[in-house]
Amino acid sequence: MLPAPHRLRDRRAFQALYQGGQRRSGAGLTLLFQPMPAGCEGIPSQVGLVIGRKVSKSAVKRNRLRRQLREILRPLCPNLKPGYRLLFISKANLLTYRWPELRAEVHRLLQKADLLVSTDVDSTGADSDAKPS
């Protein structure tokens, strides 16, 4: 689970990202991001996930993918530049990704968008090839 200050939950924030967010695309994910409104400087960046039915009609598979993405993002949250809203949107082929590929895709998109405070951060967690249960 993402730390509470890093969760994007506001419907209007999701809509604002869809309408005016900058976009970075990878093979399995699209990242939408934009700075928070004025007066929100210094607030930790907030992250939202969208896993649509195009990925799988099975809610079990979509929820599993959502849990995996949250676990990948959790250790990265302290290293995100403050004051941004981020939205990761899945593509249909994301279900075929294995854990290391998924982790690399998220890290690549964050670097592409220049949203990491330092790029030498190990985004893999404690064990680089271990998959959480």
Curated annotation (Swiss-Prot):
GO terms for cellular component: ribonuclease P complex. It holds the Pfam family Ribonuclease_P. Its EC number is 3.1.26.5. Transmembrane segments: none annotated. Disulfide bonds: none annotated. GO terms for biological process: tRNA 5'-leader removal. Keywords: Endonuclease, Hydrolase, Nuclease, RNA-binding, tRNA processing. GO terms for molecular function: 3'-tRNA processing endoribonuclease activity; ribonuclease P activity; tRNA binding. It catalyses: Endonucleolytic cleavage of RNA, removing 5'-extranucleotides from tRNA precursor. It is an enzyme of class 3 (hydrolase). Signal peptide: none annotated. The keyword RNA-binding applies. Gene3D superfamilies: 3.30.230.10. RNaseP catalyzes the removal of the 5'-leader sequence from pre-tRNA to produce the mature 5'-terminus. It can also cleave other RNA substrates such as 4.5S RNA. The protein component plays an auxiliary but essential role in vivo by binding to the 5'-leader sequence and broadening the substrate specificity of the ribozyme. Belongs to the RnpA family. Consists of a catalytic RNA component (M1 or rnpB) and a protein subunit. This is Ribonuclease P protein component. It comes from Synechococcus sp. (strain JA-2-3B'a(2-13)) (Cyanobacteria bacterium Yellowstone B-Prime). The lineage of its organism: Bacteria, Bacillati, Cyanobacteriota, Cyanophyceae, Synechococcales. The gene is rnpA.
